[in-house]
């Protein structure tokens, strides 16, 4: 590609600050906001957004930085999955950025050397955008844009989207500096998630050490269940708890039928995990019948009994919340 170069591009100061892996969700949010502000300064754009994808594919703006004088905020708004089609999301997994320096530029056709062949533009940085996306940008008052992917576990976790009202071309070195900042945050986010998961596992171990103590005090599960189930409900803020020990089932509060418990266990086994979480059983467990239980946490193979397989199901009912959608 013959990339446009501005011989007099403004110098960019490289950040010498190396942030530590955040210790809390609040610190992670602060680092995300700082990233938005740094990218805004580096790019000279009008607005930078952190757009995280939800499990259903919709996206929500979690952080935003705006140039002084730019009005209107997208923070907290949610946008439908169709705004960023599947094929576009796959391209973000292959490329360090996507840039549209001028949304009003007339596209120039590219022809393959071999007659009748279609050139693969997957890694072409200067390819044009689809007419639908260009109309989308025009409706937002955006003349130029840059997007940087946040990839976690091989999946597109979020997009950093930079907008400017008038067409604006950045140099490759400028884009690479922005990429380095976003990748640094990406690595810290990965380590933060890994640390949080380990903390959850360690916390579960401490909790079930307490459960063992309760069982030992009562001598058998049947007599310990009332105290144990109350403690589990309070500790995990659950609406119901079920314990499966071999062929026996114990329940307190809302619960699942043995058939549904088996379906959940099979889904967890298919994903090869001992801690399986879902905030929507209808979405995450195919063929799930309707019930008052909307979400469940399954902790399988608990070390509570050396003679039986022990699985714990923590259930929650439906939680209603408001979603603010962007657009009309």
Model region roles, listed by residue range:
Residues 143-151, 296-303, 307:
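Short hydrophobic beta-strand micro-motif common in sensory/regulatory domains
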Residues 51-111, 244-266, 282:
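GAF sensory/regulatory domain recognition
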Residues 105-142, 280-298, 318-328:
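Signal-transducing coupling segments at domain and membrane junctions
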Residues 1-14, 40-62:
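Hydrophobic or amphipathic alpha-helical targeting/insertion segments
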Residues 130-131, 253-293:
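A charged amphipathic helix-loop-strand protein-protein interaction module that recurs
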Residues 1-6, 66-67, 151, 158-169, ...:
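Short beta-strand-to-loop transition segments that serve as allosteric relay/switch motifs
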């Amino acid at each position: 590609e013959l990339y446009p170069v501005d011989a007099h591009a403004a110098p960019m100061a490289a950040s010498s600050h190396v942030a530590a892996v955040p210790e809390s969700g609040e610190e992670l949010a602060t680092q995300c906001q700082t990233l938005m502000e740094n990218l805004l300064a580096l790019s000279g754009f009008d607005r930078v957004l952190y757009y995280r994808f939800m499990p259903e594919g919709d996206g929500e703006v979690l952080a935003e930085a705006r140039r002084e004088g730019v009005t209107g905020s997208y923070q907290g708004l949610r946008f439908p999955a169709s705004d960023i089609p599947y094929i576009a999301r796959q391209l973000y997994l292959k490329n360090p950025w996507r840039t549209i320096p001028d949304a009003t530029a007339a596209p120039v056709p590219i022809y393959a050397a071999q007659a009748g062949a279609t050139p693969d533009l997957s890694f072409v940085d200067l390819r044009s955008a689809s007419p639908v996306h260009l109309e989308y940008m025009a409706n937002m008052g955006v003349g130029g844009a840059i997007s940087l992917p946040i990839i976690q576990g091989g999946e597109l976790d979020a997009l950093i989207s930079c907008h400017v009202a008038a067409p604006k071309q950045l140099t490759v070195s400028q884009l690479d500096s922005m990429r380095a900042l976003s990748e640094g945050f990406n690595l810290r986010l990965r380590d933060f998630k890994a640390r949080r998961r380990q903390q959850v596992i360690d916390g579960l171990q401490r909790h079930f050490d307490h459960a063992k103590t309760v069982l030992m005090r009562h001598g058998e599960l049947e007599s310990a269940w009332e105290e144990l189930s109350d403690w589990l409900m309070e500790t995990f803020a659950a609406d119901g708890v079920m314990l499966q020990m071999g062929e026996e089932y114990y329940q307190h509060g809302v619960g699942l039928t043995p058939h549904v418990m088996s379906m959940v266990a099979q889904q967890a086994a298919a994903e090869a995990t001992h801690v399986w979480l879902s905030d929507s059983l209808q979405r995450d467990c195919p063929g799930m019948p309707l019930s008052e239980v909307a979400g469940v946490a399954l902790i399988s193979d608990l070390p509570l009994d050396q003679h039986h397989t022990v699985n714990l199901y923590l259930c929650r009912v439906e939680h209603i919340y408001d979603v603010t959608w962007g657009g009309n």
